[in-house]
Amino acid sequence: MKQLYTRWGKNLDRDHVLEEYPRPLLMREDYQILNGWWDYAFTIDYKQPQQYEGRILVPFSPETALSGVGRQLKPDEYLWYRRNFDLPGWDREKGQNRILLHFGAVDQSCEVRINGHKVKRHTGGYLPFEVDISRYAQESANELIVAVKDLSDTSYHSKGKQKLNAGGMFYTAQSGIWQTVWLEKVPETYIKEIKTVPDIEKKIIRIKVSSSYSTDKKNVDKLSRNLPIEIKIRKPGLYPDPVVKPSQISTEDMLETAVLAVSDKWIEIPIESISLWNCETPYLYYFEVKLGDDRAISYFAMRKFSLETKVHEEFLRICLNGEVQFQNGVLDQGYWPESLYTPPSDAAMIFDIQEMKKTGFNMVRKHLKIEPQRWYYHCDRLGIVVWQDMVNGGSYYKHWFVTYGATLLSWLRIPMRDVYPRLLSREAKAGRLEFIREMKETIRLLGNHPSIAAWVIFNEGWGQFQTEDMTRIVRRLDPNRLIDQASGWFDQGGGDFSSLHNYFFKLFIRPERERASVLSEFGGYSYREPGHCAKEKLYGYGICKNKKDLEKRFLERWSGVRNLIPQGLSASIYTQWTDVEEEVNGVFTYDREVRKIEPFQ
């Protein structure tokens, strides 16, 4: 495979890697980024190595060019990371503060050790986790060890588009630390979580603040238990420039102050003159939360996604703030040639989102991957709607059934039930339980982001099971968003959408009374831009001779989409945003250097 680089990968400052504050919805002043050079080693046995093989640039996976390693972690191996760090002024004997160690994501299972102590085990390659290391931390020369195991696509764990034997619509498998690692100093009792739910009809924002007392009641004294929580909301604003650290947010011009007696209780705060969030004016309300000695900055937006039938129409339409919005989306795999899952920089993420909007898209479907939280923050502040996929898992996919057979059944309008665990790769009970846990954690992680309009539970039958039960779980956890329960096929008749994929046939929809019609994947036309392809082999859904041919076929297909809108079509999603390895059907090339489809309306 030819190694391509984006401009951000070429210009990466390896001494300052992804240093922006990684959690925009709960920001604090006192933090330390641990990205940078770590020691690494591969082993066959689960035994900490005495010697390390070299240095790896965290948070880039060892399979990537930017990591400096360029080696695949195999299912029968372990990957070990090591680095030292200091905590100036830290004195654990005083017990006045805590040190939290955060990992944005580690693929797939890992164990964390601090100064020889095993402090955390975690499984789930797409979700963040933290560990309180106060008990074992010292002022200087702390040793941090992370041991990683990644079975990739050989097990039922979540894997997205990763495949050890990559090809076609599946891409190079990656492993290990792939999102930011960071430390945070907090008081003994600190703000653990902030939840926000806007209500534009009532003109209120509902906020719930949870403290560390909620999860550590035995070790918190009575005084800490009763600490009041103060919330100050700032006037709404537009943020064309990104916030990279909490000190950039002024606490002046506050709208409202509220005091809560205890944590874990919802409070309703009136917003008298609301500024609505939309794609043209994505207003954000920053607010400050104080709990004793702890202070955090967060934000929310006033907006509402809904399905409504408008006057003189018989179809349900997707609405934003009560107004019909045709969601013209693009499928985004979130891959980078030099760094796979990890965006090479904050600017790289911003480029993708801004160019999506320039192209004419007002929505992006994040496909089978959970991005770093800053990606969603940029969607919030720049004003683009997000459909978020749950990450697929399950055993080896039987493509003769879930891909080729399902395409034909969908065209023939023959329904297929989700009661065949062997055919749908969901025989393992442990895998089903793991999917449910990760689905819940995904909603909890991303639920505050105003840009997210819909949760996509299953894609094309990959690991699909108990679809109606999963839909009920999601609806209970988040009743304020839309649900695509089965994107593509294996529709079980629930959720908010009749969701079709159509790459090969004449475009059509099946209008329903209870659900909106969406074309959740279409297009996928392939064109190889000379000098900008990672592989010689080509994959896509219709091969174009040149850029002009691609543009012609795209516009013809887009015209077909537009003709379906009066018939009830509410959203469409073009495949895809960029080329990825063999799949050269992007609006942009893999290296983001050549636009293959010009902006359209």
For every predicted segment, state its role.
Residues 1-31:
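N-terminal pre-domain segments of enzymes
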Residues 2, 39-45, 71-191, 214, ...:
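Accessory beta-strand-rich segments of carbohydrate-active enzymes
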Residues 26-48, 173-176, 189, 436-437, ...:
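Substrate-binding clefts and catalytic carboxylate motifs of secreted carbohydrate-active enzymes
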Residues 38, 116, 181, 285, ...:
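Conserved, mostly hydrophobic/aromatic
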Residues 113, 127-130, 134, 143, ...:
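Active-site mouth of glycoside hydrolases
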Residues 113-119, 292-293, 321-322:
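Short strand-turn-strand beta-turns centered on an Asx-Gly dipeptide
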Residues 135-141, 210-310:
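Extended acidic/polar, glycine-enriched regions
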Residues 185-215, 312-317:
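Surface beta-strand/loop "capping" patches
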